[in-house]
Amino acid sequence: MDFKQHIAIVPDYPKEGIVFKDITPLMNDGKAYKAATDAIVEYANKRDIDVVVGPEARGFIIGCPVSYALEVGFAPVRKLGKLPREVITVDYGKEYGTDVLTIHKDAIKPGQRVLITDDLLATGGTIEATIKLVEELGGVVAGIAFLVELTYLDGRKMLDGYDVLVLEKY
């Protein structure tokens, strides 16, 4: 499926100079959303995944249906102060600023094989931080899946040595 048909291009959002790739039209089309989920599930099935991890918020949108289809758990990565129990944290840079990400300390057991999912690979800061959290807990990053990659931002260089699936590139 040509997923680009289901991704809206929004100039100057969230600020001037940014060309936002909006995945909500893809999610609004059940067949397209299912096809994207199925493509990631097919990729994950070859990697013996124990748990899916996704950063908020759009990583949840991708990761939850994938974890459901794989019959494995989903571990959310959230901004500081959003998870109720003991967490580990990491500071990170993103396309337009800096922030802190957290994951529950018991979300991943040492040796578990993890699939990280997110909607978009831009500069790579969010995923690099998510990888650090997973690996600090002893998880093995078995794969990383994105709907969209913005190749001109070179985020892929942050993922050298990791197996990456991207459904559409810009």
UniProtKB/Swiss-Prot annotation:
Its main location: cytoplasm. Coiled coil: none annotated. This is Adenine phosphoribosyltransferase. Pathway: Purine metabolism; AMP biosynthesis via salvage pathway; AMP from adenine: step 1/1. Homodimer. Catalyzes a salvage reaction resulting in the formation of AMP, that is energically less costly than de novo synthesis. The keyword Glycosyltransferase applies. Keywords: Cytoplasm, Glycosyltransferase, Purine salvage, Transferase. Belongs to the purine/pyrimidine phosphoribosyltransferase family. It is found in: Cytoplasm. It comes from the Bacteria. InterPro entries: Ade_phspho_trans, PRibTrfase_dom, PRTase-like, UPRTase/APRTase. It catalyses: AMP + diphosphate = 5-phospho-alpha-D-ribose 1-diphosphate + adenine. HAMAP family: Aden_phosphoribosyltr. GO terms for biological process: adenine salvage; AMP salvage; purine ribonucleoside salvage. It comes from Bacillus mycoides (strain KBAB4) (Bacillus weihenstephanensis). It is an enzyme of class 2 (transferase). GO terms for cellular component: cytoplasm. Its EC number is 2.4.2.7. CDD domains: PRTases_typeI. GO terms for molecular function: adenine binding; adenine phosphoribosyltransferase activity; AMP binding.
